[in-house]
Amino acid sequence: MATARVDDVQKNLGNKLNVTDPANAAMSGSVTGIQGNAGVNNASGFFNQQANNVAITSASGKKSGAAAAVSFEQLNDGNTYTFAQPLYGTSNKMDATMSNSVSNIQGNAGINNAAGAGNQQKDDVALSSASSAVLATASAGGTQVNHGIAVTTFLPINGTASITGSVNNVTGNVGLNNAAGLSNQQVNSLSVAATH
C-alpha cells in the first residue's frame, strides 16, 4: 500500500499584543522558473502562521493500493490585540506585498501572503500512486476555529496584502492564500490517489 498523508496543526493561544510599530514584508521577482514543488510564505505583522506541506508516495504490485489523505486544524483562541497610538513619525501600518513572483512553474506551488495579526494560512498536498493496484482512496478535511478574540483599536487597523503580476504560467496545482487583517484562516487542500 502506498500511503501519503499530511496532518498539520496551527494554534495561536492566549497571545497579548500591543501594536505600535509598522511592519512590512515584500517579495519581488522571486520564485520563477521552477520544476517540481515550490512553497512560498510572505508575512508582515505578528503571530502569523503559514505552512506548505507535501507528501508523495508510490508503489507497484497487483495487490497494492494507493491512499492519500490531508487533515488540518487551525485554532485562534483567547488572543488580545490592541492597536495603540503609533510611535512618533511612524504608523501601525502592516503591508505584505508580492510582485512579479511565482511564475513559470511546472509542478506544485503553495503561496501564502499575509499582513496583520494572528492570520493562519496553509497549503497541503497529498499524492499517492500505485501501478496495477486494486484500490485508490483520497480524502481531505479539517477544522477552523476562532474563539475569544478581543480587539481594541485607538486608530483604524491599517493592513494591506497585495499580489500583482504574479502566479502566471503555472502548469499543475496552485494553492494561493492572500489575507489582510486579524485572525483570518485560509486552507488549500489537495488529495489525489491514482492507480494505473
Task: Identify the residue ranges that each predicted region occupies.
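Low-complexity repeat regions of mature extracellularly deployed or surface/particle-associated proteins
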Residues: 1-196
